[in-house]
Amino acid sequence: MKTIDIHTHGIGGYDTRTTVEDHILKIAGIHGAHGISEIIPTIYPATLRVMRENMLVVKKAMERQKADLSYQPSAISHEKIEKTPILEPATITGIHLEGPFLNPNKCGSLNAMTLIAPTESNFLELIEGFEDLIRIITVAPELDGADKLIRRIADMGIITSMGHSDATYAETEAGFKSGAKGITHIFNAMREFHHREPGILGFGLMNDDVYIEVIADPYHLDPKTIELIFRLKNPERIIIISDSVRESKAFAPSPVAVPGWRTGAGVTDMRGRLLGGSMTITEAAKRLIDAGYDEEIVTRCITENPERYLL
């Protein structure tokens, strides 16, 4: 059984904002050591040139993995989640683009200055030469031109995940009908639920067919919020992600491990703003199982559900 993290920017001092392919392989190695079989490295929004440079590095790292004839991907059973370290690196299976077609008003920790309109010309310039490697693109469905772009992405066999968004319920539903398949890190960096406008959050929880990413560490979502998700949402459509970043697992004796960010109460910047997830998906799954969640359901959230989503 494969464990799959579809949303990781980095880990252990490395991230996808690099021109060094060894950094991407280090990310795969650290995830593998935590029992993850496959990862989809996630690219930060930046200029199109920089994003393409980052994608090229991931592509080269994938090619190096494939060229290593001794390489075997990790696989674990339900009973071995976070109990037996896996030494083989996780297999890099593609690229997730988190942007740049996002709403700057819901950018979260991302750089709002790098977010651009979802035009066809911007899209084609971004993906040229990487069409076969890109698995997921996060798009804010309320942006002008987003519906057309989502249809184009779906026609190419790439998944659109809706996120970093101020979309209403109707705008989210329109994005779903245009071909979007998921919602990026539900509750985080999106319009809040209102009793007169449930928004993207309400659609994500209520629609039985749309997939939702969940950052199940102790910092992004209150335990009762996670309980709400598992009570309301079709369990076949919940995908636990790490949303891990360079600072995740980069421990240091001081609370400030690298200038500008802190560990302890999650991975945050100096203002206390969350930068990304602090746990691997296997750690997050074990945490939920230890809290009393059904082991089979939780395990599917890091195995069968993401695998089905990516088909």
What are these regions (language model features)?
Residues K2-I4, S161, I238-I241:
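Residue-level marker for buried hydrophobic side chains located in beta-strands
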Residues H9, L25-V57, A90-N103, F130-E142, ...:
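Divalent metal-dependent hydrolysis catalytic cores, especially in the metallo-beta-lactamase
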Residues G10-D22, I43, S109-I116, I159-G163:
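Active-site mouth loops of central-metabolism enzymes
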Residues L48-E53, E142-D144, S161-S165, I215-L232:
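Active-site glycine- and acidic-residue-rich loops that bind
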Residues Q65-P89, S254-P259:
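Short, basic, low-complexity termini and linkers enriched in Ser/Thr/Gly/Pro
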Residues L97, P104-G199:
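Divalent metal-binding pocket/active-site signature
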Residues E171-I297:
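Active-site-adjacent C-terminal substructures of enzyme catalytic domains
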